[in-house]
Amino acid sequence: RTFQGAFDVKKQILTAALLSLLTAGLTAAELTVAATPVPHGDILRLVAPDLKAQGYDLKVVEFSDFVSPNIALDAKEVTANYYQHKPFLDDAVKSRGLKIASVAPIHILPMAAYSKRIKSLNDLPKGARISIPNDPANGGRALLLLQSAGVIKLKDGAGATATPLDIADNPKRLRFTEVEAAQVPRTLDDVDVAIVNSNYALGVGLNPIKDSIYLENKDSPYAVVVACRLGDEQNPAVQALVKALTSPKVKDYMINTYKGGVVPVF
């Protein structure tokens, strides 16, 4: 009986260990992604069930600014982030020494000009005030938009990170107010024109197609990307995220929900 009792105890231990291993195999791995709320947080929540089916529990960590998601990624607080275009990422890597990289482009958020005072950029009065993002990538993008509209002319060689100091010709003597990208929509009551990133426009109920007075060219190089730490580009979790975000389901959602405010590039 003593031998049989010892055998039964060992059998129970082995059974428990086997069940523990099986349960561990069935437990989904956590996939943490940093994002801005609209549209990125919404799109991520849309694909959560698809990632669950691939064995990942998606956790979305939302930020209201453009800096924190990259800091969190570099500090290994999240697995990936999804909120920024490639020029912004490149500038962050260069200026902050971050060890992060782009994995895949997902969509374009057309930048646009909005106003409560005029109906067209042609109606800008002399000395008009224009608010633009204060980071180099998005501020430069806003100035390039104004140049494409014929409102200003930039110096030769001034590219994606142009600043108001790079303006060569400003016939209407426009005055520029530089604020954090997330705060630009809040300046609409105080300026003649605000140049707003679409994610922040959508967040306050503005649609780039319906509500703007000038829209960025459709050939924009500013595709929003999934980013990860250097060396993690082939991480199965990161690849699963890219697969989920580039599905027909997501493309249909972007087109039908945002009506031109979010343009898929896959």
Question: How should each PLM-predicted stretch be described?
Answer:
Residues 103-153, 251:
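A conserved helix-loop-strand patch within extracytoplasmic ligand-binding domains
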Residues 110-121, 223-235:
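A bilobed periplasmic-binding-protein/Venus flytrap-type ligand-binding module shared by bacterial periplasmic
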Residues 91-103, 118, 190, 195, ...:
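Ligand-binding "clamshell"
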Residues 66-97, 112, 119, 142, ...:
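Pocket-flanking alpha-helical
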Residues 138-147, 245-265:
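Periplasmic-binding protein-like
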Residues 60-71, 158-186:
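Short helix-initiation/N-cap motifs at beta->coil->alpha
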Residues 37-59:
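Short, polar/charged alpha-helical segment
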Residues 74-84, 128, 151, 172-174, ...:
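Alpha-to-beta junction loops
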